[in-house]
């Protein structure tokens, strides 16, 4: 089995296992499928942004009751770009939650609105600036971009200015705050949806 075939088999197997675990846990296969699809959408946000930056990226690997992850190597990539890759997952997951919310509202489906609530909640929590979470990766990228010297010197002579890099840090930080606010607004708007 080739490396990519193994990745596809792992994706399918771990997706199915997560689907079964969530379906049994919530007692509804539709909810289980929707929840695992929301996680998949989140991970494909990372994949699309990583590929947009020319990186090789793995297919998602699901971990039942925890989530999923993708791997990529970002050596040489500007820190603000790695921050964007980190934020792309919660952004895509938030869009998926909005779609579930719209469908749930249109069809008066409590389980879809509850699915949207959990999508907003988990993506918002994932933005906490902590360690391995996406928020931690974004925060590190912003801080590392900002902390680079604004002017680089060689032998006492200024040779390069990185003001554009610092402006990127500000732009990514604004995106971070706006995304977090949007996800929290989604949590608050759907929190009384009740169990399905």
Spell out what each predicted region is:
Residues 1-196:
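Hydrophobic transmembrane alpha-helices and their immediate loop junctions
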């Amino acid at each position: 089995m080739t490396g990519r075939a193994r990745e596809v088999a792992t994706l399918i197997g771990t997706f199915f296992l997560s689907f079964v675990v969530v379906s049994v846990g919530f007692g509804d296969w539709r909810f289980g499928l929707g929840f695992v699809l929301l996680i998949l959408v989140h991970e494909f946000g990372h994949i699309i942004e990583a590929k947009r930056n020319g990186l090789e990226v793995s297919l998602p690997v699901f971990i039942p009751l925890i989530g999923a992850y993708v791997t990529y190597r970002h050596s040489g990539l500007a820190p603000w770009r790695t921050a964007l890759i980190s934020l792309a997952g919660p952004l895509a997951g938030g869009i998926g939650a909005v779609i579930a919310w719209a469908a749930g509202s249109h069809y008066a489906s409590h389980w879809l609105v509850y699915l949207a609530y959990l999508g907003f909640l988990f993506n918002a929590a994932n933005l906490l600036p902590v360690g391995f979470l996406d928020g931690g990766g974004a925060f590190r990228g912003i801080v590392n971009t900002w902390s680079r010297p604004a002017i680089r010197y060689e032998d006492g002579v200024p040779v390069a200015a990185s003001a554009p890099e610092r402006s990127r840090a500000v732009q990514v930080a604004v995106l971070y705050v706006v995304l977090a606010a949007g996800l929290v607004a989604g949590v608050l708007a759907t929190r009384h949806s009740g169990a399905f």
